[in-house]
């Protein structure tokens, strides 16, 4: 009887161990900077640089001065509060007219949009913005304003976004 009870107990323990989950629980650690970065990006969405002429990376002085008076302090503040491992990305855009890549004597939307981003990057640098925490890129016509005609002039713009390095 004792032997049968002992066998039953050993069998139950073995069964319990075998049925137990061997998967380790993974903890989902959220990025502690996610809320700050999201708030910064929402603020930056309000300040696109617009007004570029077709195939041009030159910003009309009047439009730039008006934009810079309002937006430069915001950009400076955001850069000063960037968490470690993040940069402010300056992104140039183009409308969907013309080729994306260089073709013949056409520079292509990628180059034009990158030149626009560089123009704004350099202008912010001249205004005293710390460019050590900034980067720039051109995306051509691949990111039109949602709901807009991709060929519309308002897609010729420069936007800002806080991104991981």
List where the protein language model places each region:
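Second-shell loop/turn segments in exported
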Residues: 52-65, 105-110
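Short secondary-structure boundary/capping segments
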Residues: 41-42, 80, 126, 150
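Periplasmic OmpA-like peptidoglycan-binding domain that tethers envelope proteins to the cell wall
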Residues: 93-165
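Periplasmic peptidoglycan-binding/anchoring modules of Gram-negative envelope and division proteins
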Residues: 57-94, 98, 121, 125, ...
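Envelope-exposed proteins and targeting segments
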Residues: 46-50, 55, 84-86, 132, ...
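N-terminal targeting leaders that direct proteins to extracytoplasmic destinations
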Residues: 1-48, 57-58, 64-73
């Amino acid at each position: 009887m004792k032997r049968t009870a002992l066998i039953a107990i050993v069998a139950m323990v073995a069964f319990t161990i075998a049925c137990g989950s061997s998967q380790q629980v993974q903890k989902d650690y959220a990025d502690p900077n996610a809320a700050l970065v999201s708030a910064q990006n929402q603020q930056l969405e309000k300040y696109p640089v617009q007004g570029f002429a077709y195939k041009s990376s030159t910003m009309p002085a009047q439009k730039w001065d008006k934009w810079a008076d309002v937006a430069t302090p915001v950009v400076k503040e955001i850069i000063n509060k960037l968490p470690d491992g993040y940069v402010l990305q300056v992104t140039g855009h183009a409308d969907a007219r013309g080729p994306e890549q260089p073709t013949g004597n056409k520079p292509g939307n990628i180059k034009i949009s990158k030149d626009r981003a560089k123009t704004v990057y350099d202008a912010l640098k001249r205004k005293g913005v710390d460019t050590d925490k900034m980067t720039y890129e051109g995306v051509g016509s691949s990111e039109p304003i949602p709901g807009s005609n991709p060929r519309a002039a308002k897609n010729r713009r420069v936007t800002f976004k806080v991104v991981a390095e």
